[in-house]
């Protein structure tokens, strides 16, 4: 299969990680594969958010796939993206389309993982690295759908030209090293991984080899010697738990060095020392007991020796030998070690014969030349006669037995501290020691003072008194608060014990949180403390209960960590849920922590709402009005306890999430606050769930007209003068429950209906007059009212009201021409003279609008003579 070159693949991946990952509420910087990457300008984050949310809103697989396809097409049609893809080759453009689909697929609701930030590798890259966290449970053998990548085979020149080799794998199928990029590039290494790479024709997928729970990191094993020989530079969790890799002892790392750096004599010497060390492993516990003050155990172990480590990255450990049981072991020089980074350590001596450290070091330095052992490695000759090796400066240095034991036989926690100080330079360690040396894990000034008081077993009283006199003499000129830190640092370095001032004890309260937050390579925080903060401004996420930093970390909203905020902004649900099937209460983006609710206080879930109240209902009010469930634009279903204002709807809709129609509506009703939200929304009246039919109001024992009857009555208003014409309305059987729905007539249909009614009424009037002997063409009497064509009701004249129809005089005998039967006489319809002067059909009162129309009307009736 022909693929793109590694350079083109790196350029494509950098552009997509910048647009589709970093700009989608991501709070860290993604490492780029290409060194010369330039981000695309002019693309709004709002467009990217809309594309991602359109994919996350689809729950079913078919709808989500269609949404991914539409979002991909919309993304490729952006103006800036069109300009970028125009610079790609046809093969690279096809890979750009496939790569876009890979990155958009991770935002589907059915996707079981998400890309997060890990702080485990901060000591190596000085920033957080990306990782992959599981949102669902995977069993063994399950394929992690969506976590895929693309492979591009590399040549020798490309391997040398590629500066960042963080995603280079060896493929036996392709016959060489390949560059793998895509969502699968964020999977980190672990020596005991829970997944593995599976090659496919289109690239690479990942399959679970162990059960993966929710919240676990998805890891794979890169290779056996990927991080040096036997992965001795590995920082994974397995190496941390087993004290291997970079967490292992310096002696083990020195023995694993390559054979080319040492000659045969050195190899033989290392083998001998390793064999003797294995034989003396039983004496190590006794040596630790001797450090606690046991004279018998110290005499038994005084003849044993500890081998000297030949590691290049670790100070040499002294070889302790004692010629007699009562003599003090002789310290051995270590070499050139910085004065500011070391702590003096007293050797193991019996408790009855213990002497102060400053006196013992002075006596030992005077007699150091006498007790030189010629068998010691010549590299130690000519150095100072003090024993120093790096350790954390804590108040327990002189009393703790672990501080008197070489680091490779100390517990794992102590070795981590040694390794942490060894990775930083001298100035950083000095500042770190000055701040953390006065801290105690138990906390509090009282506990600290009790810990600082040492007994007669570890320190001489005269030495302590002289030290107090010196400190009081130094503080005589000024106050304690003005004492320089340089003097405190020198006093701690030159003395065998620690002395603390009141300033140090007050500083303990401030920096206790800093001690807990200090970075430790063994501390693995997926979404934990982001950075180091001396002030201790941290907060616990109310959703996932993780600790995050408010001052130095990313800016988040409310009480939620960056991971939960990003997940809620995309999927509108609390982490790790992505649909409404999980009935989980949401308190996202609220400015106060959630209150504890009882079981009877919970409302209904979304499926129950749709089942009982219809799918369009968005809120439920309890009978007592204590709990409100509402629908938001930015974050869907959320809960809040409101007993003070039970009937008031909570409003926290973001302005940028409103449509233009909604924004116009709410801007008229409320006001915009500084926080960018809309408040003072109008209250909507509460409507019952099932409204009963309203009772029919009775007027004079006559029921109100229905909607259909009122429509027919309006159509019947333009009738002839004072004669009522009964119109046969179609009988509609109305059901007993409720009012029937009548189809609303169009205005053209109403006009046509009125026209037909007028024609029928005119024909009936003509037939009636012919039957009574009155000519239809003769003008009507002077007092008669013309036939209106408007919608207004006809008015009866006073003459008609006074004279009943039976007392009217008989009309004259009609002429023979007019005595034709109605069937023989043709129906002639009079048309107006001009359409422009005709009466307007929209006239409701029946009156004419201007004198011209009045004159034309009188001319038609024969009353107006020119």
UniProtKB/Swiss-Prot annotation:
Keywords: Chromatin regulator, Chromosome, Methyltransferase, Nucleus, S-adenosyl-L-methionine, Transferase. Residues 243-310, 359-378, 383-416, 443-495, 661-853 are annotated as: Disordered. One of its GO terms (biological process) is methylation. Residues 359-372, 728-739 have a biased composition (Polar residues). Residues 253-263 have a biased composition (Acidic residues). It catalyses: L-lysyl(20)-[histone H4] + 3 S-adenosyl-L-methionine = N(6),N(6),N(6)-trimethyl-L-lysyl(20)-[histone H4] + 3 S-adenosyl-L-homocysteine + 3 H(+). PROSITE patterns: SAM_MT43_SUVAR420_1 (PS51567), SET (PS50280). Residues 390-403, 776-789, 834-845 have a biased composition (Low complexity). The lineage of its organism: Eukaryota, Fungi, Dikarya, Ascomycota, Saccharomycotina. The gene is SET9. One of its GO terms (cellular component) is nucleus. GO terms for molecular function: histone H4K20 methyltransferase activity; histone H4K20 trimethyltransferase activity. Its main location: nucleus. Histone methyltransferase that trimethylates 'Lys-20' of histone H4 to form H4K20me3. This is Histone-lysine N-methyltransferase SET9.
């Amino acid at each position: 299969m022909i693929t793109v070159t590694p350079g083109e693949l790196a350029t494509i991946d950098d552009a997509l990680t910048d647009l589709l990952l970093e700009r989608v509420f991501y709070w860290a910087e993604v490492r780029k594969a290409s060194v010369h990457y330039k981000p695309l300008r002019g693309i709004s984050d709002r467009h990217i958010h809309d594309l991602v949310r359109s994919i996350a809103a689809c729950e079913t697989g078919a709808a989500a796939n269609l949404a991914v396809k539409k979002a991909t097409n919309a993304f490729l049609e952006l103006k800036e993206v069109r300009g970028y893809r125009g610079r790609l080759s046809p093969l690279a453009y096809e890979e750009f389309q496939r790569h876009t689909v890979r990155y958009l697929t991770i935002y589907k609701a059915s996707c079981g993982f998400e890309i997060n930030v890990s702080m485990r590798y901060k000591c190596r890259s000085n920033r957080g690295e990306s990782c992959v966290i599981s949102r669902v449970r995977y069993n063994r053998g399950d394929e992690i759908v969506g976590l895929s990548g693309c492979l591009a085979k590399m040549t020798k020149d490309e391997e040398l030209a590629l500066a960042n080799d963080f995603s280079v794998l060896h493929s036996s199928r392709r016959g060489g090293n390949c560059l793998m990029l895509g969502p699968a590039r964020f999977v980190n290494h672990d020596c005991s991984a829970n997944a593995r790479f599976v090659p496919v024709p289109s690239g690479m997928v990942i399959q679970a080899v162990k059960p993966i729970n929710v919240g676990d990191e998805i890891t794979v094993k890169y290779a056996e010697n990927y991080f040096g020989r036997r992965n001795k530079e590995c920082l994974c969790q397995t190496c941390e738990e087993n004290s291997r890799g970079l967490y292992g002892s310096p002696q083990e790392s020195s023995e694993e060095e390559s054979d080319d750096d040492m000659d045969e004599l050195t190899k033989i010497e290392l083998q001998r020392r390793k064999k003797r060390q294995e034989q003396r492993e039983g004496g190590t516990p006794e040596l630790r007991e001797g450090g606690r003050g046991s004279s018998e155990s110290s005499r038994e172990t005084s003849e044993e020796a500890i081998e000297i480590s030949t590691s290049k990255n670790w100070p040499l450990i002294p070889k302790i030998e004692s010629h007699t049981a009562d003599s003090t072991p002789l310290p051995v020089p270590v070499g050139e070690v910085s004065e500011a980074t070391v702590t003096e350590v007293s050797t193991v001596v019996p408790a009855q014969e213990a002497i102060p450290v400053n006196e013992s070091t002075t006596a030992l330095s005077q007699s150091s030349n006498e007790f030189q052992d010629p068998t010691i490695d010549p590299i130690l000759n000519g150095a100072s006669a003090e024993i120093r090796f790096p350790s954390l400066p804590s108040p327990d240095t002189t009393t703790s037995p672990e501080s008197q034991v070489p680091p490779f036989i100390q517990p794992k926690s102590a070795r981590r501290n040694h390794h942490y100080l060894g990775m930083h330079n001298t100035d950083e360690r000095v500042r770190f020691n000055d701040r953390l040396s006065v801290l105690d894990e138990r906390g509090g000034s009282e506990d600290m003072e009790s810990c600082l008081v040492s007994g007669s077993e570890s320190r001489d009283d005269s030495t302590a008194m002289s030290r107090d006199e010196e400190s009081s003499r130094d503080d005589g000129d000024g106050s304690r608060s003005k004492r320089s830190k340089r003097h405190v640092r020198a006093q701690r370095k030159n003395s065998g014990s620690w002395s603390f001032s009141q300033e140090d004890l007050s500083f303990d309260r401030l920096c206790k949180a800093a001690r807990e937050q200090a970075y430790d390579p063994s501390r693995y925080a997926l979404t934990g403390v982001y950075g180091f903060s001396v002030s201790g401004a941290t907060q616990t996420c109310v959703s996932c209960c993780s600790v995050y930093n408010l001052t130095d970390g990313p800016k988040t909203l409310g009480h939620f960590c960056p991971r939960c905020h990003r997940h809620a902004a995309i999927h509108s649900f609390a982490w790790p849920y992505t649909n409404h099937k999980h009935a989980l209460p949401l308190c996202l983006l609220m400015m106060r922590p959630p209150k504890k609710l009882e079981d009877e206080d919970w409302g209904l879930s979304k499926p129950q709402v749709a089942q009982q109240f219809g799918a369009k209902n968005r809120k439920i009010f309890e009978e007592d009005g204590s709990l409100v469930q509402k629908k938001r634009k930015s974050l869907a279903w959320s809960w809040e306890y409101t007993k003070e204002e039970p009937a008031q709807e909570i409003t926290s809709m973001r302005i940028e999430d409103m449509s233009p129609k909604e924004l116009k509506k709410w801007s008229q009703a409320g006001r915009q606050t500084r926080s960018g939200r809309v408040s003072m929304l109008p209250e909507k009246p509460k409507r019952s769930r099932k409204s009963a039919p309203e009772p029919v109001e009775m007027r004079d024992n006559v029921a109100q007209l229905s909607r259909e009857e009122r429509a027919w009555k309006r159509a019947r208003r333009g009738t002839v003068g004072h004669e009522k014409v009964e119109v046969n309305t179609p009988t509609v059987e109305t059901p007993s429950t409720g009012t029937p729905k009548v189809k609303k007539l169009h205005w053209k249909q109403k006009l046509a209906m009125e026209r037909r009614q007028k024609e029928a009424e005119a024909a009936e009037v003509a037939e009636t007059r012919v039957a009574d002997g009155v000519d239809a063409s003769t003008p009507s009497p002077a007092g008669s009212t013309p036939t209106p064509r408007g919608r207004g009701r006809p008015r009866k004249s006073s003459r008609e009201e006074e004279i009943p129809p039976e007392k009217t005089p008989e009309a004259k005998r009609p002429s023979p021409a007019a005595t034709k039967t109605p069937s023989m006489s043709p129906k002639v319809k009079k048309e107006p003279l001009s359409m422009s002067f005709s009466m307007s059909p929209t006239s409701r009162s029946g009156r004419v609008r201007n004198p011209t129309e009045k004159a034309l009307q009188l001319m038609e009736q024969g009353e107006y003579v020119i």
